[in-house]
Amino acid sequence: MGLPALEFSDCCLDSPHFRETLKSHEAELDKTNKFIKELIKDGKSLISALKNLSSAKRKFADSLNEFKFQCIGDAETDDEMCIARSLQEFATVLRNLEDERIRMIENASEVLITPLEKFRKEQIGAAKEAKKKYDKETEKYCGILEKHLNLSSKKKESQLQEADSQVDLVRQHFYEVSLEYVFKVQEVQERKMFEFVEPLLAFLQGLFTFYHHGYELAKDFGDFKTQLTISIQNTRNRFEGTRSEVESLMKKMKENPLEHKTISPYTMEGYLYVQEKRHFGTSWVKHYCTYQRDSKQITMVPFDQKSGGKGGEDESVILKSCTRRKTDSIEKRFCFDVEAVDRPGVITMQALSEEDRRLWMEAMDGREPVYNSNKDSQSEGTAQLDSIGFSIIRKCIHAVETRGINEQGLYRIVGVNSRVQKLLSVLMDPKTASETETDICAEWEIKTITSALKTYLRMLPGPLMMYQFQRSFIKAAKLENQESRVSEIHSLVHRLPEKNRQMLQLLMNHLANVANNHKQNLMTVANLGVVFGPTLLRPQEETVAAIMDIKFQNIVIEILIENHEKIFNTVPDMPLTNAQLHLSRKKSSDSKPPSCSERPLTLFHTVQSTEKQEQRNSIINSSLESVSSNPNSILNSSSSLQPNMNSSDPDLAVVKPTRPNSLPPNPSPTSPLSPSWPMFSAPSSPMPTSSTSSDSSPVRSVAGFVWFSVAAVVLSLARSSLHAVFSLLVNFVPCHPNLHLLFDRPEEAVHEDSSTPFRKAKALYACKAEHDSELSFTAGTVFDNVHPSQEPGWLEGTLNGKTGLIPENYVEFL
């Protein structure tokens, strides 16, 4: 029920009904007044709360903006960069939103609080004042009326008329006040319908504007939100794979820590307790010590994990001798004494165990070492990049593209291991290797075929993209600019050997076809990168850092798939020069110890001095020009070459011969001299000039001189007979009775001085085995039972009871 209307005619009657109606209107005004007061109070509390909320959100945004993600590794993937940038994006959105909130709060006081206060004070307050006046006039009118009615009729007529006139005036004034009051009450009741509600509407409009601004921010944020969601999902997927790899490595380290020890530049390193003499007795201080065998340098860093840091300055000494302490000569166990060249007295050290002391002793006294004899963690098989290998890959690709290109989870779902091995044994059987490429029967499941393809690539002696280029590929993936990544990877691919590049092109063309059907098989470019990254760029050693680089391996594969036509069908824009190739090899050799397979297949390779390498290149180039113009000019060029060979050059590194099974099956007829020729080291001392000493010089020294001096002749006359080259050498090379054996029977010439079976030999250089049939060793290792092998350029010897192959030019006979 609404309020009854106040009629002006009722003011004259001033009936009880009028009074009741007026009271109901007055009660409504009181109710409205109280409500507005409470509303203003709540509105102020709301504004204060909004200010506190805005302040808290700004502080939250500032915290987000200040935090910086630190990822493992020296670079971040695109996904990691997107995630790392997300906190700053969140902070920006929140700040923008709070700026709009502050504007809304400032307007709220003007559009809500002030109008309500004004309405309550001016309108309702005026009605209250009118009521007071009305009540006062009512009381006055009623009093005068009662007094007037009590006048006696015996009064004079003039007095009665005057009293009547006075009552009429008071009544008239009362009626006017009553009419004005009724008018004001009705006015306030009508005004509150808009003057009270309108500020609330304006406040809500400001609130809606704030929310709409948030909606617009959300729309603008949508693209980044989608990108971030994808990056988070990709990172989560990589985390699952990385976690399993790290957990597997952790279990291997638990089972055998020494076998999976990382390659270190130090011969030996670890914690030792060093005895320090004090004024009153001695104390044992914990040090982290490193030892380099080549320089005989021992570095001692005082460090205790319990105290949380270093306890002094580092100290380095040069080792003179190392002696084990007798058990009865000292109370401590596992002790040994070290004498230094540049420090007087004896340094007594305590190892952590008997085995630890044995390793330190063997490292320092030149005994046969057992450190760093890590087995290659990669599974090596009989797979090769030969005609059979290409046939196997083509068969698998043909079967996949004809029968299973749309199968979901292609290459991600693995086949049964026994079936995979059986299929590989069938494909690798030489009896069936020459069959057509479509002879994989339909009985083999697609997942078995795809697993066989991946397994064969993992069985190769080295990854398809080669160990020595792995760091370069990873660095290319870490470049910020996408074009730079593609360009660098393009250049690196064209530095791969021809067979590797052909196989990689074959594989990438196939993976591009798979990715083109990703709507059916669900294998996007990113998914294929996850599958093939660790296979094509598998690390040389299992470490946490290598596992963390898997994400960049995946990026490399993604780039190869997406840009396979450009990378494999076009030449790089800026091909690398020889000097750049040399620098890249030098950086690679500086960053980690090279394995045997990583040494380049050249006669000599400079690993320290770029200037000396360029000098030798200029000498060889001049010899090439002389040979091309006149073969007899070799006599002139030899005089300029001989002084360089007579000088002892420590920068000349011996190159390990290439195993025959790792060579291409059909070398090009136009290629340089076959690398299956034995290679020789440069002489370590100047060659004698007298005929007597020349006759007695080792064949190996003469061979080294011959190879270096006439490299140009050999390259220029590759198609001519070897005896023609030999006839040119006779004119300027000191006569040696076995020189012709270098060309007729190279193995016999090399082994003439070592024809006696079961001799001992000493390693001149360190080498890490790349095959199970090879031996790993360091410089100074002594081999037993050394004798010629069936493979050119290799010897067989025994080390620690194991017999295997040794690069011939890595050792000298004792």
UniProtKB/Swiss-Prot annotation:
It comes from the Eukaryota. Residues 662-672 have a biased composition (Pro residues). Pfam families: BAR_3, PH, RhoGAP, SH3_9. The record marks R412 as: Arginine finger. GO terms for biological process: actin cytoskeleton organization; mitophagy; regulation of small GTPase mediated signal transduction; signal transduction. Phosphorylated in a PINK1-dependent fashion promoting retrograde mitochondrial trafficking and clustering. Residues 624-696 are annotated as: Disordered. Gene3D superfamilies: Arfaptin homology (AH) domain/BAR domain, Pleckstrin-homology domain (PH domain)/Phosphotyrosine-binding domain (PTB), Rho GTPase activation protein, SH3 Domains. GO terms for cellular component: cytoskeleton; cytosol; endosome membrane; focal adhesion; mitochondrion. The modification Phosphothreonine is found at T670. Residues 7-262 form the BAR domain. One of its GO terms (molecular function) is GTPase activator activity. Changing S668A: Significantly reduced PINK1-mediated phosphorylation. Residues 624-648, 673-696 have a biased composition (Low complexity). GTPase-activating protein for RHOA and CDC42. Facilitates mitochondrial quality control by promoting Parkin-mediated recruitment of autophagosomes to damaged mitochondria. Negatively regulates the growth of human parainfluenza virus type 2 by inhibiting hPIV-2-mediated RHOA activation via interaction with two of its viral proteins P and V. The BAR domain is important to associate RAB8A (or RAB8B) and RAB10 to endosomal membrane to promote tubule extension. The BAR domain is also important to recruit WDR44 to endosomal tubules. It is linked to Leukemia, juvenile myelomonocytic: An aggressive pediatric myelodysplastic syndrome/myeloproliferative disorder characterized by malignant transformation in the hematopoietic stem cell compartment with proliferation of differentiated progeny. Patients have splenomegaly, enlarged lymph nodes, rashes, and hemorrhages. This is Rho GTPase-activating protein 26. It comes from Homo sapiens. The gene is ARHGAP26.
